[in-house]
Swiss-Prot record:
Entry similarity comment: Belongs to the DVL/RTFL small polypeptides family.
Annotated S-S bridges: none
TM segment ranges: 8-24
Functional summary from the UniProt entry: Small polypeptide acting as a regulatory molecule which coordinates cellular responses required for differentiation, growth and development, including leaves shape, pedicule elongation, inflorescence organization and fruit maturation, probably by restricting polar cell proliferation in lateral organs and coordinating socket cell recruitment and differentiation at trichome sites.
Organism (species): Arabidopsis thaliana
Primary location class: membrane
GO biological process, one term: negative regulation of cell population proliferation
Top-rank taxon: Eukaryota
GO cellular component, one term: plasma membrane
Protein name: Small polypeptide DEVIL 5
Tissue expression from the record: Mostly expressed in roots and flowers, and, to a lower extent, in leaves and stems.
InterPro entries to which the protein is assigned, alphabetical: DVL, DVL/RTFL_small_peptides
């Protein structure tokens, strides 16, 4: 019984870290897209 409790805690921790990693990756992707759009608009304006 004790081993199952620790394994559940481990899976929760893995899911939490994966969730945070996904959020960070999503933020980086959004920043990358916005940066690309700004560069394209600036180059197009010239």
């Amino acid at each position: 019984m004790k081993t199952t409790g620790s394994s559940v805690g481990g899976t929760k921790r893995k899911m939490w870290s994966r969730g945070v990693g996904g959020v960070v990756r999503e933020q980086k992707a959004k920043l990358y897209i916005i940066r690309r759009c700004v560069v394209m608009l600036l180059c197009w304006h010239d």
